[in-house]
A protein has these predicted regions:
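Eukaryotic gene-expression regulator signature that favors modular helical reader/repeat domains
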Residues: 1-180
């Protein structure tokens, strides 16, 4: 999957194989999914794998492989695209592992070149509860985030949602600190 040419064959196989064959492929790469995702060629093959997930077993392999590596993947040039593909293709409940990790490492993610963009995509794809989970963390650290070259974009993004409750919460955090 990481070969400059072989990754294209892997992508084609995923498109045309049966669910049972796809189960075998996904299960066989499960332990290596993170390292494959971090590779410039492998990331495309993993994204294609996510595009063609067709059974619950396959989805669970993906979730299990990435669950402890979300921040590492988000902060990587190649890996962040895999997390974004999960956000786009998996349902909100299956993506909860991403939301939990991003919320737990909000400042680290929001102040990173790739992380700030992925965090915005998290907000886009979130359920109502997940959005509240993220915005609560962003709000708590908003004073720190607005002083960062990348974090400030995340706070602006929340304000651009034009949700009065979000705006009020962020405004409250800034009270007494506007002059600093």
């Amino acid at each position: 999957m990481t070969d400059p040419f072989g990754n294209y064959l892997c992508q084609k196989l995923l498109e045309h194989c049966t669910n049972a064959q796809r189960d075998l492929i996904v299960e066989s790469i499960g332990d290596d999914l993170v390292s494959i995702s971090l590779n410039m060629h492998g990331t495309r093959a993993v994204q294609k794998t996510i595009d063609f997930l067709s059974t619950r077993t396959q989805t669970l392999v993906i979730i299990q492989a990435f669950a402890e590596h979300v921040v590492e993947l988000i902060k990587d040039l190649n890996g962040n695209h895999v997390i974004q593909k999960c956000l786009h293709r998996l349902d909100a409940q299956d993506n909860q592992f991403i939301y939990d990790s991003v919320a737990a490492h909000c400042v680290d993610v929001a102040t990173h070149r790739h992380g700030c963009c992925v965090l915005q995509r998290c907000i886009d794809h979130a359920s109502h509860a997940q959005r509240l989970q993220l915005v609560r963390e962003i709000t708590m650290y908003s004073l720190t985030l607005v002083q960062d070259p990348f974090g400030n974009y995340v706070v602006q993004y929340v304000l651009d949602l034009n949700e009065p409750a979000f705006t009020a919460a962020i405004t409250h955090e800034f009270l007494g600190h506007v002059y600093q």
